[in-house]
From Swiss-Prot:
Any further remark recorded for this protein: Despite having helicase-like domains, this subunit does not have helicase activity.
Protein name, entry field: ATP-dependent helicase/deoxyribonuclease subunit B
Requisite cofactors: Mg(2+)
Species this chain originates from: Lactobacillus delbrueckii subsp. bulgaricus (strain ATCC 11842 / DSM 20081 / BCRC 10696 / JCM 1002 / NBRC 13953 / NCIMB 11778 / NCTC 12712 / WDCM 00102 / Lb 14)
UniProt EC number: 3.1.-.-
Keyword hit for GTP-binding: no
InterPro entries referenced in this protein's UniProt entry, alphabetically: ADDB_N (IPR049035), DNA_helicase_suRexB (IPR014141), P-loop_NTPase (IPR027417), PDDEXK_AddAB-type (IPR038726), Restrct_endonuc-II-like (IPR011335)
Keyword tRNA-binding: no
Highest taxon above the source species: Bacteria
Enzyme class: hydrolase
Phylogenetic classification of the source organism: Bacteria, Bacillati, Bacillota, Bacilli, Lactobacillales
Gene Ontology terms: biological process: double-strand break repair via homologous recombination
Subunit structure: Heterodimer of AddA and RexB.
Amino acid sequence: MIKIITGRQSDPLQTEIIGRAARNYLAQPGKDTFIIVPNHIKFNTEVAAIGKVAQLQGREETSVKNLHVLSFSRLAWFFFKKADLLMPESLDDAAATMILEQIIDKRRDELLLFKNSHANSGMIKQVYSTILQVHTGQLDLGNLLERAADPAVALDLDNETRDKLHDLDLIYQDFLEIVSEKHFATKDELNIQLNQLLASRPDLVSQASFYVTDFSHFSIQEKMTMQLLAAFASEMTFAFKTADGSVIEPAAGEYDYVVQKTIKDLTGYFSAHDFAWEREKIASPASPARDLNQAWQGQGQPDLNNLQLVKADSRYAEAYFVARTIYDEVALKGCQYRDFLVLAPNLQEYETYLAPILRQNQIPFFDDLQQQMKYHPLVLLLENLGKLLQQAGDTPALLSIMKTRLLIPDWYLEGDAEAGEAAYLRDIDQLENFALAHGIKYSLWQKPLKDFTKAQVIALDQEQYQKWLDRLDKLRDFFVSKISRLARQLKSEKDSMTAVKLFFDFLVKNGVSARLEAWRLKASESGDLQQAQQPEQCWNLLLSLLKDYLLVNPENFAWADFFKMLTAAFSQANFATIPASLDAVTLSEYGMVQTSGYKQVFIIGAANGSLPQINDQPNFLTTENLASLADFFDQDAYLEDSQQLRNLDQEYQFGNALALASDRVYISYPVINSNNDLLDPSIYYKRLLKLVNGREYRQRDLPDIAEKDRTEFARQLLLFLTSPRASLGYLAYAEENSAQSPLVAKLVELSRQYEEEKAEEIAEGMAYDNNPQDISEDLAERLYGKDLLSSVSQLESYYQNSFEYFLNYGLRLRPRAENELNAIQSGNYFHRTFELLLKEMQKKNIEIDKLSELDLELLLKQVRSEILQEPLYQQFLRDPFNEYLFKVFDKTTSKVAQSYRRKQQENKMRATYGELAFGPAEKLAGLVLPLKKFAGQRKISLRGKIDRVDLFNGDQHVLGQLIDYKSSDHSFNLARFASGVDLQMIAYLDVLEKNRDLLAGGRQFDLLGAFYQYVTRKLNSVNSSSTGALFDSKLQLKENLLGGEDKLKLSGVFVSEPAWYQEVDKALEKKATSSVYRGLKLNKSGGFGKKDNFFSQDEMRELLEYVEALIEDAASEILSGQIALNPFRQGNNTGLAFSDYKDIFYFDQQLPTNSYRDLPNLKKADLLALVEKRLRQRE
């Protein structure tokens, strides 16, 4: 007898079917009773079915023998076993992909679409999906193409569809042939073979009863299974949910079109074959769920008190609303955790919110979101082994393998294995540091680590760490030798069986399988059953894939295809999940079939774009292609447009979700996403909002501390409270930000009684101040020494942000060294080039202005060759791209040098010293300043290097100027100097002044200035609106700007003595504008006029005194232990812009305790007034 039971979506059809099946089982315990459900709910349905049997027996627990709860795939396995048939080997998607790639390559010349194009993995996946549809649909593509080509048939296909079918037919036939030869079964083959078995062996089901529920649609083969069971089974019962429980003629666009079409197809078959069947509509009792379902379908507008719409500030607020509501319902109303279901269109978006918040509230939950295998250490090992065979010595791949902890050398595990593993991980970290610092990659991994230490770029390069380096080298050799040996073996091996055995032996002999087993046991012993399953599931899948590969490709081993198959298979694989407890909240994806019996359901993430879930994923045969093929299909052989079916079923599926709760439904959306982009509610949310007359609850991230009414504030606060542990943060926030409230104080006191330690942590967190505390003078002395030895750049960093100075030069924290040619290293290369060029000219007693352009280039070539032989630059040159960059740098230095050569023909200043070092133990004395704060008992010694010092021996005096090379355009900024952020130019002038006798040989020594030399190849823009444009407003060419020569002029701070510049700059004899110094122009009276970067000799002396005061102030504060988070700011430039320590600072200008130290805009007069004031204080 066949029975079709129908009801509304809100009716307990699943419970009804389970009850009937349980009673049938008890009435006929010797016969098989089957409940067929979607695979997703098989476990919960089985629990419910056994529970129902126990209830009918009057027991708390029971066992069953012939009651089976199965999905379609499990049904196939059941009958294969019962018929004593060999179960076919299931073809993995990755193996199928490999077969299809082989077919396409073989047939390429015969194919139309793939003849001249590469079939990527996405396209192969689409083709495979379509092949499965064709196979399941029993479609004869060859016959279809013949019919389309027959002039007598009044049907035609468009060219795109015809070409796709042509290629598909060729690929499909070859695919079936190969699969048949290899004795594989595709993932749809199980249903096909099941149907063949049922058709030939009706005795298998003749005494069985079948109950089918929770389907709204069947695939072609599933529908055939239902037809066969209806024909041969003793009893067949279907349960379907329609709009109002009635069965009507299906019409596309109707609310329940898909399920009505399914019923129509079945009943039509039954009638056509004269099967006895009857239809039963179960009673639909009045309930809140029915009212909501009717309202959703537009059948009346009842009072929807069971529906709560929630507008949340964020996804965090949504998740907290879920947790708080569940907590309250369980704690105050006696609900159980299994009464709650949480659905999300994209559950992955809420993984970082829901799970932590539920755990914090001690709410047990089962997340049925499938966890991907591709992040498991075994999968990472396999994937990166493939990368190393593709490119030997791939550093990220090699380090990833080391970090999997699957290949730990034995010598680490002797004795205490846990301590040994910790030591291994420390060594891996150090080896990674060493490799990144020295740019070790590819073939360089074959070299001993000591070969790289000459560069001296990391602490491990030093002799004192040789033993540690030897240990790291042993570790390097362990991995490199083993992986290289495996690579050689696999690349040379042609026999698949031998190659797979070599690969498997590599894993086993190196302890991978033993390691996985150890992880499994450890997780099992700790009670984490989910984690305990993962190593075994990964290993079993690997074994299955190895077997598949040998079946697909038993002879000609291709290592690239082998690893490609493994990677592809694991990237699509998921871990099987099991609930840790039967009493747990269920988290699931919206759109998946769910069991009944939930009291309250949350649908979160109901934002526009998420609901409805319109599917537009690309398929090989598009909706348009399938529409043009529709006329060629018949009742028993066709292709379904599954995408269109899903889209047509959206409102029905949402109705299913609404009907899952017997008591209450919550629907929420966040107003912003994780990127702080504004979100609109879903059209479904808006539709329901109208039904409840705009009744909407607003879930805030935090209680509203602006609420003045104490009663209302208390009410709001209570809505955030759950367990003492989870509530403490909100209570601390309320206590901190609201007026004194007896309620808040009492709640805080109660929470502290349960969570004293957590309360202290939160109190500390609320009082957290990211501003550092000063250290004692004793500790400062231990960090810096009794006297401070420092450089100008270090003191500048102190004035830029003193906390950074402490981290860098006090604690000596450094970012990890990496072998990259960054801006600092490029600047060093420029400096080194000009330094050696000057030394070479002095060695050969050559004046640069006497050299020809070619001679200078030859000299530069010699210098560059010498530089690139240095260990550091040899290390950089291991990267081919760096070799290119050095050539670019060389063009820049050539341009600057040639410009200098030309200008020296008009300038009498001569480069005398390059990279002139000063300070203790140097020929040139540094600044040594006693510190008044310490009564002169302590001092600061300044050391450093001046890029270049130029001298001119005149009749009356010696003039000196210093040059500082810069990779970006610089000018002397008064505010930055006044604040100490830019000390360099004036401090270096002070050093020259202090060494006047040495530099001038006892003669009169005068400072000309300190200048920046911009090292650049930049040109001026043709159409720029600035003064640097090549053409003026009358479109006249500015010849002085050609080639960007103006950018190479010296700029900086000038001593305002026109006569001195006329002494050294010959161009000033002919014109008022200097060709060497930017901005230097004589006026009619022979002076410079008023300019902020020109200072008289007396003013310059004041600046030199002022810079000493700044140096002394900084040193005194450093040695006193003063530390402050006080970054400067000037326009868009801040003391944090290029900092390596931002993650330590946590600087946030929104915090009341964090603020920038803004530099004022200063004119020359302002600066001099400031200088005079400070110097008076110093006296």
